Curated annotation (Swiss-Prot):
Enzyme class label: transferase
Organism placement in taxonomy: Bacteria, Pseudomonadati, Pseudomonadota, Gammaproteobacteria, Candidatus Pseudothioglobaceae
Enzyme Commission number(s) from the entry: 2.6.1.9
Modified residues (N6-(pyridoxal phosphate)lysine): K215
Alphabetized InterPro entries for the sequence: Aminotransferase_I/II_large, HisP_aminotrans, HistidinolP_aminotransfase, PyrdxlP-dep_Trfase, PyrdxlP-dep_Trfase_major, PyrdxlP-dep_Trfase_small
GO terms for biological process, alphabetical: L-histidine biosynthetic process
Keywords: Amino-acid biosynthesis, Aminotransferase, Histidine biosynthesis, Pyridoxal phosphate, Transferase
GO molecular function, one term: histidinol-phosphate transaminase activity
Family of the protein in this entry: Belongs to the class-II pyridoxal-phosphate-dependent aminotransferase family. Histidinol-phosphate aminotransferase subfamily.
Name recorded for this polypeptide: Histidinol-phosphate aminotransferase
Highest taxon of source: Bacteria
Essential cofactor(s): pyridoxal 5'-phosphate
Length: 354
């Protein structure tokens, strides 16, 4: 037995590392990234701005300027606290670290895989409630789970990833008001939705929101934020590692996130293309296509694995979810540019000989 195998926690040896597929020379439609790169003009301005980054110095420990930039971009009320993370994953882990060893984390399935992974990393007990066949939360089942497991944390993606739907608001409110747990609503796709719980933080002291800039064009920055009451943020900030937002992310985000008109214009294009792509998929009769309020679409397809491989062979990478709970024969495609979406549709139509 090697040194690392004798040294490592036994439960860590039993899990697999998060897998990111090779995507070189492919149209990437698998990771819910924005398809839009910076314009040449904006790139030139950005590079000029970046010159002032003092790489020999540690970054601002509290990221105050970036905090204000994000508040303006997302219209976050001044009375709420904001905590920044190196991606939302760091903030999910920070919340888990605030729990006692053995506490229970509750979520729904299928949902964002990192809730369960981070729970296991931090030696907490992970429990989940299966969604209905229509990917909704059954209120009675969730309430029963809350009473049975007495969770310390409840994670709910709103809208849900990978299904793309918004859960019933009244059910979410019932969950928040009926538990002593901290309820974390992950609004990663807030820009593409018709609803948000942002202002509800004033009503529910146990409500925390997560957001990210990854889905609005800046996945490479690895920047997430936690929004909650100021008291909650003050306490959670004790667990934040020092200098967790590096200088390049701070300087880049402070410049790029002020381009609100460009960000909103790109979001509008994606919303329009989401409808175009949805309509095109619905016309392929063998597919079952699920409505989405995110920047991706989930669909169920015959010969799932063969279609997935056929798309890769033709230069398009999407996400194969067919082995996940409740997602048998399901694939997920990220909304791309008009050209990328058309290429994807053409390949799917060719596969089914339409």
């Amino acid at each position: 037995m090697s040194f690392i195998n004798s040294w490592l926690r036994s439960d860590i040896k039993m899990i697999n590392a998060y897998h990111v597929p090779i995507s070189a020379d492919m149209v990437k439609m698998d990771a819910m990234e924005s398809p839009f790169s910076l314009s040449d003009e904006l790139t030139d301005q950005y590079l000029t701005y970046l010159v002032d980054a003092q790489l020999n110095r540690y970054p601002s420990p509290s990221s105050d300027k970036l905090n204000q930039t994000l508040r303006l971009l997302m219209n976050i009320p001044k009375e709420f606290g904001v905590l920044l993370g190196n991606g939302s994953d760091e903030l999910i882990q920070l919340l888990a670290l605030a729990c006692n060893t053995g506490d229970t984390v509750l979520s729904v399935e299928p949902s964002f895989v990192m809730y369960g992974m981070i729970t296991k990393f931090t030696r907490l007990n992970y429990q989940s409630v299966l969604l209905t066949d229509d990917f909704e939360i059954d209120d009675d089942t969730m309430q029963k789970a809350i009473k049975t497991y007495n969770p310390k944390l409840i994670f709910i993606a709103y809208p849900n990833n990978p299904t793309g739907n918004m859960f019933n608001r009244e059910i979410i409110e019932h969950i928040i008001s009926s538990t002593k747990a901290m309820v974390v609503l992950d609004e990663a796709y807030y820009a593409y939705t018709t609803d948000s719980f942002l202002t509800d933080i004033a009503k529910y002291p146990n409500l925390v929101l997560l957001r990210t800039v990854s889905k609005i064009g800046f996945a490479g920055l690895r920047l997430g934020l936690l929004i909650a009451t100021q008291d909650t943020v003050n306490q959670l900030n004790k667990l934040r590692l020092p200098y967790n937002i590096n200088i390049l992310t701070q300087v880049s985000a402070n410049f790029l996130l002020q381009e609100k008109n460009t960000i909103n214009a790109n979001v509008s294009v994606i919303l329009a293309q989401r409808q175009v792509l949805f309509d095109a998929l619905v016309k392929i009769n063998v597919l079952k296509v699920y409505p989405s309020q995110a920047n991706f679409i989930l669909f169920k397809a015959p010969n799932t694995n063969i279609l997935f491989d056929f798309l890769k062979e033709n230069g398009v990478l999407i996400k194969n979810l067919s082995v996940k709970k409740k997602l048998i024969n399901c694939l997920r495609v990220t909304i791309g540019t008009e050209e990328q979406n058309q290429k994807f549709i053409n390949i799917v139509e060719k596969f089914y000989i339409l």
